[in-house]
C-alpha cells in the first residue's frame, strides 16, 4: 500500500491538521518528518473539541493509528511531555506514539542561543519563533547534536553534552554576555525528562517499511510550508528543514519509490508569519477582513498572520517542486460575502511580466502582483458537502485556482470542522 505525503503549498498555516485528521481514520500510520515545536496544527473534532498540536502528529486524535515522530524532527523534551500530558488530561490515548531513535533533541542552550541571536540581529532578524529550532539543526549538520537514543546511555549523553557546551558556552558568554550553562544540570534534567518518553523510542525506519510491506498505508505529515523550505523557500526567511515532499523520504526513512501521492494544502487566500517577501500582502480593509474572518493568528506563537490574496505563482511553484498530485483547498468559506476576489496570476518586475517564481530573492522583493478579478459570492457555504452545493461563482473560483495551480483540487474545506469538507475525489481510493 502507498505512502502519501501531505505538505503545505504556501508559507505554512494552510490547514494541514484538518487534512491529516480527515484522512487519519483510513490510514494506519501518521508520521511527522521534519520541524519541531515551531509549527502548530489545529484540529476540530465533530464533537466541537479543539486541539492545538505542535510536535505530536495530528493522527494521535484518531483511535488505532500509530503516530511517529520521525528522524527528521527536532524534539524539545519538555514540550513533548507537556503536550502528551495535555492530551492525556483530555482523555486522548497516546500509547501509540513512537519516536525515532535518530531524531535530534532540542536542549536549553539551543533556545538560549536562538533568542539572543534574534535580539542581536535587531532589524535584520529573520523572525524565528525563538524555540531553538535553527540552532538545533545547526548542531545536527555540524555533527555535534544529541539524538533521542543518546538518553539510553548516561555516559555517552554526558560526553556529548559536555563537548557541545564547550562551544555553546563560549558563544553565550563571550559574544552575548550571558551566563554559561552547567553540563551536569543539563544532563540530569534531560535524563529526568527521558523517563517520560524512553519507552516510546524505536527504530521507526524499520517499523514503517515493514508496515508498507504488510499492505498498510502511511501518511507523512509535513509542518510549515513549501515557501519556508530551507532550499526551495524564500531564503533566508525560511525554516531550517525541508517541509517539501523530498524531505518526507529523508525525514522518515521511507524510500522515495514508496510514495505514490503528494497532497498539497492550499488556503483559498494567502498568509505568512514573520519577515520576508509577500507579493500579494494586503494592508487595507480586505487584509483586515481576511485576518478577522479567518482567525489568522499563529497556533504556536499567537502572532497575527500577514494576509493577502491567493497567489497562483506560488501555487504553481509548489506543484513543481513537490510533484503535487492533488490539492486540498481550505478556508473557502472565509471568502463568502466579498463582491470580487482578486487572484494573482503573475508578477510585474521592472516593467516586465513573469508568470513563474523569480530566480532571485531581490526580484521577488520587487515583484508587483498582476491580478485577475473573479466574481465573489454572498452565500454561506459552511453547510455544503458536495461540490454542486456551492454557489456557481464559488465553483468557478475553485476551478480557476485548479487550472492556475496545475493539479486537481480533490478536497475543499468550508469550515473548521472535520465534517465541513467537500470531497471531489477520494485521495486514498484513487491511488494504487
From Swiss-Prot:
InterPro entries: Adenylosuccin_syn_GTP-bd, Adenylosuccin_syn_Lys_AS, Adenylosuccinate_synth_dom1, Adenylosuccinate_synth_dom2, Adenylosuccinate_synth_dom3, Adenylosuccinate_synthetase, P-loop_NTPase. Its cofactor is Mg(2+). Binds 1 Mg(2+) ion per subunit. Its EC number is 6.3.4.4. It catalyses: IMP + L-aspartate + GTP = N(6)-(1,2-dicarboxyethyl)-AMP + GDP + phosphate + 2 H(+). It is found in: Cytoplasm. GO terms for biological process: 'de novo' AMP biosynthetic process; IMP metabolic process. GO terms for molecular function: adenylosuccinate synthase activity; GTP binding; magnesium ion binding. GO terms for cellular component: cytoplasm. Keywords: Cytoplasm, GTP-binding, Ligase, Magnesium, Metal-binding, Nucleotide-binding, Purine biosynthesis. It is an enzyme of class 6 (ligase). Mg(2+) binds at residues 13, 40. Gene3D superfamilies: Adenylosuccinate Synthetase, subunit A, domain 1, Adenylosuccinate Synthetase, subunit A, domain 2, Adenylosuccinate Synthetase, subunit A, domain 3. Pathway: Purine metabolism; AMP biosynthesis via de novo pathway; AMP from IMP: step 1/2. Disulfide bonds: none annotated. IMP binds at residues 13-16, 38-41, 129, 143, 224, 239, 303. The active site is at 13 (proton acceptor), 41 (proton donor). Substrate binds at residues 299-305. Its main location: cytoplasm. GTP binds at residues 12-18, 40-42, 305, 331-333, 413-415. SUPFAM superfamilies: P-loop containing nucleoside triphosphate hydrolases (SSF52540). Homodimer. Plays an important role in the de novo pathway of purine nucleotide biosynthesis. Catalyzes the first committed step in the biosynthesis of AMP from IMP. HAMAP family: Adenylosucc_synth (MF_00011). Belongs to the adenylosuccinate synthetase family. This is Adenylosuccinate synthetase. It comes from Mycobacterium avium (strain 104).
Amino acid at each position: 500500500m502507498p505512502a502519501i505525503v501531505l505538505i503545505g503549498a504556501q508559507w505554512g498555516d494552510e490547514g494541514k491538521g484538518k487534512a491529516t485528521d480527515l484522512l487519519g481514520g483510513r490510514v494506519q500510520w501518521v508520521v511527522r518528518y521534519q520541524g519541531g515545536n515551531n509549527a502548530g496544527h489545529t484540529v476540530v473534532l465533530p464533537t466541537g473539541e479543539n486541539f492545538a498540536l505542535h510536535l505530536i502528529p495530528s493522527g494521535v486524535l484518531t483511535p488505532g493509528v500509530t503516530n511517529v515522530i520521525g528522524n527528521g524532527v527536532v524534539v524539545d523534551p519538555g514540550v513533548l511531555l507537556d503536550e502528551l500530558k495535555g492530551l492525556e488530561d483530555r482523555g486522548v490515548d497516546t500509547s501509540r506514539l513512537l519516536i525515532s531513535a535518530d531524531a535530534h533533541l532540542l536542549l536549553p542552550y539551543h533556545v538560549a542561543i536562538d533568542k539572543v541571536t534574534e535580539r542581536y540581529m535587531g532589524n535584520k532578524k529573520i523572525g524565528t519563533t525563538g524555540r531553538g529550532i535553527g540552532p538545533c539543526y545547526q548542531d545536527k549538520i555540524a555533527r555535534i547534536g544529541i539524538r533521542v537514543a543518546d538518553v539510553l546511555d548516561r555516559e555517552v549523553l554526558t560526553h556529548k553534552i559536555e563537548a557541545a557546551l564547550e562551544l555553546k558556552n563560549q558563544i553565550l558568554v563571550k559574544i552575548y554576555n550571558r551566563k554559561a550553562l552547567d553540563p551536569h544540570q543539563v544532563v540530569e534534567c534531560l535524563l529526568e525528562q527521558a523517563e517520560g518518553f524512553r519507552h516510546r523510542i524505536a527504530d521507526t525506519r524499520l517499523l514503517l517499511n515493514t508496515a508498507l510491506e504488510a499492505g498498510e498505508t502511511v501518511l507523512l505529515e509535513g509542518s510549515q510550508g513549501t515557501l519556508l523550505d530551507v532550499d526551495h523557500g524564500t531564503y533566508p526567511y525560511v525554516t531550517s528543514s525541508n517541509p517539501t515532499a523530498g524531505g518526507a523520504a529523508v525525514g522518515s526513512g521511507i524510500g522515495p519509490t514508496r510514495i505514490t501521492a503528494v497532497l498539497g494544502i492550499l488556503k483559498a487566500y494567502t498568509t505568512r508569519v514573520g519577515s520576508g517577501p509577500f507579493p500579494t500582502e494586503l494592508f487595507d480593509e480586505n487584509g483586515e477582513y481576511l485576518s478577522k474572518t479567518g482567525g489568522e493568528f499563529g497556533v504556536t506563537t499567537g502572532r497575527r498572520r500577514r494576509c493577502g490574496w491567493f497567489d497562483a505563482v506560488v501555487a504553481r511553484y509548489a506543484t513543481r517542486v513537490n510533484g503535487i498530485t492533488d490539492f486540498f483547498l481550505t478556508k473557502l468559506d472565509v471568502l463568502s460575502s466579498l463582491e470580487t476576489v482578486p487572484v494573482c496570476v503573475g508578477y510585474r518586475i521592472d516593467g516586465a511580466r513573469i508568470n513563474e517564481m523569480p530566480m532571485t530573492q531581490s526580484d521577488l522583493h520587487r515583484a508587483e502582483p498582476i491580478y485577475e478579478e473573479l466574481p465573489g459570492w454572498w452565500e454561506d457555504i459552511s453547510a455544503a458537502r458536495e461540490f454542486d452545493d456551492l454557489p456557481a461563482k464559488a465553483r468557478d473560483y475553485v476551478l480557476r485556482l485548479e487550472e492556475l495551480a496545475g493539479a486537481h483540487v480533490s478536497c475543499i474545506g468550508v469550515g473548521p470542522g472535520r465534517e465541513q469538507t467537500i470531497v471531489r475525489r477520494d485521495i486514498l481510493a484513487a491511488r494504487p
